């Protein structure tokens, strides 16, 4: 993006750059967790490359500590770029503004999603002080709310993905077709016995237990199938509930905060 600033209008250059930096950090961090040693095993262990250019170049493998440092550097730079993010400034955005590009910030790596990801990375690193600071900033923003029970009780228009809790989510227009292969109650589906489901949630008052599972039919009536990603057919079903696959959510910030306080 460097040298192409004149191609963008308004705040778009810095906001898009911030999102791109954050996405690079997100993807690299997940790759590290899969293919690299954890920070608790050894910060000096050789892990994987951190790719910073779109080029036919072989990048050197990084030590775990150096790799995590580069993840955090990208996230810090991203947060700086996103200082004018509407989710942070409170600026109202409509379709009139650049065709609404900066609307629906929860399906972009917005400022608070970056802070949430920083909390995740700092916790992984063992830097509990900074993890707590970042988690508290997200929680204290007031931009994300716990799902309300009244938005779950009507099965035809329920907020099954708990969308108000999303810091960052993907909008996958084919999500229904994907999950129906595995969660539709057929022979090849993933399912839980009712007894096991009760063990997991322990209380019939847990919203996940009450509203996110459906009962199998016929010979499968003892099984419970996840319906969190079901795509409902009602025309009244809110657009903000559709096709959402959450990647960073509000509850994680509370878990991080709790672990930091414990440490």
Question: Residue locations for each model-derived region?
Answer:
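C-terminal soluble interaction/assembly domains
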Residues: 240, 261-263
């Amino acid at each position: 993006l460097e040298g192409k600033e004149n191609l963008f209008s308004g705040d778009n250059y810095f906001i898009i750059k911030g999102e791109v930096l954050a996405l690079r950090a997100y993807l690299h961090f997940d790759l590290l967790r899969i293919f690299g040693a954890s920070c608790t095993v050894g910060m000096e262990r050789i892990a994987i490359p951190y790719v910073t250019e779109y080029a036919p170049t072989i990048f050197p493998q990084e030590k775990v500590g150096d790799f995590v440092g580069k993840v955090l550097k990208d996230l810090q730079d991203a947060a700086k770029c996103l200082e004018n993010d509407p989710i942070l400034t409170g600026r109202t955005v409509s379709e009139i503004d650049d065709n609404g590009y900066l609307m629906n910030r929860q399906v972009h790596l917005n400022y608070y999603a970056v802070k949430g990801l920083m909390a995740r990375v700092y916790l992984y690193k063992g830097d509990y002080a900074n993890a707590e600071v970042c988690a508290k900033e997200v929680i204290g923003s007031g931009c994300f709310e716990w799902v309300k029970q009244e938005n779950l009780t009507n099965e035809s228009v329920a907020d099954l993905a708990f969308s108000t809790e999303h810091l960052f989510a993907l909008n996958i227009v084919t999500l229904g077709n994907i999950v129906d292969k595995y969660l539709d109650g057929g022979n090849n589906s993933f399912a839980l016995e009712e007894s096991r489901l009760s063990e997991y949630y322990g209380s019939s008052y847990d919203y996940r237990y009450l509203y996110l599972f459906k009962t199998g039919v016929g010979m499968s009536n003892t099984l419970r199938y996840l319906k969190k990603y079901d795509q409902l057919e009602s025309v009244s079903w809110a657009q903000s509930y559709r096709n959402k696959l959450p990647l960073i959510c509000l509850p994680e910030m509370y878990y991080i905060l709790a672990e930091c306080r414990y440490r």
